[in-house]
């Protein structure tokens, strides 16, 4: 795995200085801009384009807390996260998922916009809590706990996308 932190000359930490990340991104993109390679060989132009794509990919990883956590875990353990792998050992969270899904389905069926706003705020709060928890787990190098929390964050992210879909649907009525 390429190390996006190294590419951006950033410490391998979950909490990132977003301003520094943006500054490094702009500097890298400026250095790799095609105009800088207009008089270069085709191979140098291709390498610059590949490096630019790497920079863009690395930025996406570093900006997304779930991908950033996956990256930190992989860099420290050598294990890649299998996002298709389902975590069924976390029965309490599995029950929570079912409850949230049922609640969201009920909100959609009854077209309860106020209920959706309340539910959305609850999920946003849960997301913030999990972000804080994963930050702690990663700083303590508790990779198993970090993986577990990141799985929860993945579910919450999907749920937030579903909330947005329902919000758009209800707004159209």
UniProtKB/Swiss-Prot annotation:
This is Co-chaperone protein HscB homolog. One of its GO terms (biological process) is protein complex oligomerization. The keyword RNA-binding does not apply. Interacts with HscA and stimulates its ATPase activity. Co-chaperone involved in the maturation of iron-sulfur cluster-containing proteins. Seems to help targeting proteins to be folded toward HscA. The gene is hscB. Belongs to the HscB family. It comes from Mannheimia succiniciproducens (strain KCTC 0769BP / MBEL55E). Coiled coil: none annotated. Residues 3-75 form the J domain. SMART domains: DnaJ (SM00271). One of its GO terms (molecular function) is protein-folding chaperone binding. GO terms for cellular component: iron-sulfur cluster transfer complex. NCBIfam families: hscB. The keyword Chaperone applies. Keywords: Chaperone.
């Amino acid at each position: 795995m390429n190390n996006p932190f190294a590419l951006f000359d950033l410490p391998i930490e979950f909490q990132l200085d977003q301003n520094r990340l943006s500054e490094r991104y702009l500097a890298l993109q400026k250095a790799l801009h095609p105009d800088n390679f207009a008089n270069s060989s085709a191979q140098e132009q291709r390498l610059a384009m590949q490096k630019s794509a790497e920079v863009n990919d690395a930025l996406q990883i570093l900006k997304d807390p779930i991908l950033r956590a996956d990256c930190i875990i992989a860099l420290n353990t050598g294990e890649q996260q299998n996002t298709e792998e389902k975590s069924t050992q976390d029965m309490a969270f599995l029950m929570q998922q079912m409850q949230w899904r049922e609640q969201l389905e009920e909100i959609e069926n009854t077209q309860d916009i106020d209920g959706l706003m309340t539910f959305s705020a609850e999920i946003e709060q849960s997301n913030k809590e999990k972000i804080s928890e994963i930050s702690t787990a990663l700083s303590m190098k508790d990779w198993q706990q970090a993986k577990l929390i990141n799985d929860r964050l993945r579910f919450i992210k999907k749920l937030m996308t579903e909330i947005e879909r329902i919000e758009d649907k209800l707004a159209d009525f």
